[in-house]
């Protein structure tokens, strides 16, 4: 260790040769900061903790789109009306969360630092499948708490610069990444959202059409799942929608999402069950 390093007062572990994983570095130097170590054990009754609900992902020719409703529930109560469930992971990937809100947000922050840490040490970016596996390792570390009901099951999506396509990855509670072919939904309203996606999805969707499909899917989920929020026109709370393309991550402007959502709500006044898929 140099005199400069000693002057900084950092432990020797910070200068030990290791892998490019920030999670492993944190495990060695400050394990108490990992999300898995910040939740009490299961020896006491678990209180109602806010849970995020429904998220969807759709592939389209230019890339991939993620969307989520804005509600978090705590037992039978609405804990938050404007929760952000879609987040940037890095320049060409994004993650949407369903499950225990506090742990999910910690995992997303950890993933963001993990990807940045790897890039700084290796002077190269991880491949998209590599990023998906890194998130899987973070989820796997939470398995003990998932078995107590504190599960986090995100959807990871991004643009594969090598293959030139958007990709969607879903996970089980053990952290195993599985690629979804065209679309995916997670959370309590996912069965209803997935049903809408099956009927409305087409491989040749434009970005505007993909956004409309996501809003329709979340609307259907909100109709049948009490934990999923529909559009709140009075409070101007609309779904969060983001895209990842060759140009990078982009969150759709709130005004654009508002106009799209209002058009969907207006159309539902004429056809409450939503658009009908053509038989072809």
UniProtKB/Swiss-Prot annotation:
Protein's UniProt keywords contain Zinc-finger: no
Signal sequence extent: none
Top-tier EC class: hydrolase
Molecular functions (GO terms): threonine-type endopeptidase activity
BP terms from Gene Ontology: modification-dependent protein catabolic process; proteasomal protein catabolic process
Entry's EC annotation: 3.4.25.1
Cell compartment(s), UniProt: Cytoplasm
Propeptide: 1-52
GO cellular component: cytoplasm; proteasome core complex, beta-subunit complex
Ways its activity is controlled: The formation of the proteasomal ATPase ARC-20S proteasome complex, likely via the docking of the C-termini of ARC into the intersubunit pockets in the alpha-rings, may trigger opening of the gate for substrate entry. Interconversion between the open-gate and close-gate conformations leads to a dynamic regulation of the 20S proteasome proteolysis activity.
Pathway the protein takes part in: Protein degradation; proteasomal Pup-dependent pathway
Gene3D superfamilies the record matches: Glutamine Phosphoribosylpyrophosphate, subunit 1, domain 1
Keywords assigned: Autocatalytic cleavage, Cytoplasm, Hydrolase, Protease, Proteasome, Threonine protease, Zymogen
Active site annotation, chain numbering: 53
Record field: catalytic activity: Cleavage of peptide bonds with very broad specificity
Function: Component of the proteasome core, a large protease complex with broad specificity involved in protein degradation.
Family per record: Belongs to the peptidase T1B family.
Subunit structure: The 20S proteasome core is composed of 14 alpha and 14 beta subunits that assemble into four stacked heptameric rings, resulting in a barrel-shaped structure. The two inner rings, each composed of seven catalytic beta subunits, are sandwiched by two outer rings, each composed of seven alpha subunits. The catalytic chamber with the active sites is on the inside of the barrel. Has a gated structure, the ends of the cylinder being occluded by the N-termini of the alpha-subunits. Is capped by the proteasome-associated ATPase, ARC.
Matches recorded under HAMAP family: Proteasome_B_B
Protein name in UniProt: Proteasome subunit beta 2
């Amino acid at each position: 260790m140099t005199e400069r390093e000693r002057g900084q007062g950092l432990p020797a572990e910070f200068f030990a040769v290791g892998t490019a994983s920030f999670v492993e570095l944190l495990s060695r130097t400050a394990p108490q900061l990992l999300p898995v170590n910040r939740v009490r054990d299961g020896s006491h009754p678990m209180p109602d903790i806010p849970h995020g609900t429904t998220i969807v992902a759709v592939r389209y020719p230019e890339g991939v789109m993620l969307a989520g409703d804005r509600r978090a529930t705590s037992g039978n109560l609405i804990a938050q009306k404007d929760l952000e469930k879609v987040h940037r992971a890095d320049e060409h990937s994004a993650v949407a969360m369903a499950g225990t809100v506090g742990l999910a947000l910690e995992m997303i922050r950890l993933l963001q630092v993990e990807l940045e840490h790897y890039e700084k040490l290796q002077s190269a970016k991880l491949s998209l499948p590599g990023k998906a596996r890194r998130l899987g390792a973070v989820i796997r570390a939470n398995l003990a708490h998932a078995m107590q009901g504190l599960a986090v099951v995100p959807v990871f999506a991004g643009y594969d610069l090598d293959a030139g396509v958007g990709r969607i990855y879903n996970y089980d509670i053990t952290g195993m990444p599985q690629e979804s072919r065209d679309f995916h939904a997670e959370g309590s309203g996912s069965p209803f959202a997935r049903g809408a996606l099956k009927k409305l999805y087409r491989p040749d969707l434009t970005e505007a059409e993909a956004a409309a499909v996501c809003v329709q899917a979340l609307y259907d989920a909100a109709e049948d799942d009490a934990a999923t929020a529909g559009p709140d026109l009075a409070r101007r709370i609309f779904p969060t929608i983001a895209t990842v393309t060759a140009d990078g991550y982009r969150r759709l402007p709130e005004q654009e999402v508002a106009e799209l959502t209002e058009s969907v709500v207006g159309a539902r006044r004429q056809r409450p069950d939503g658009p009908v898929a053509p038989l072809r």
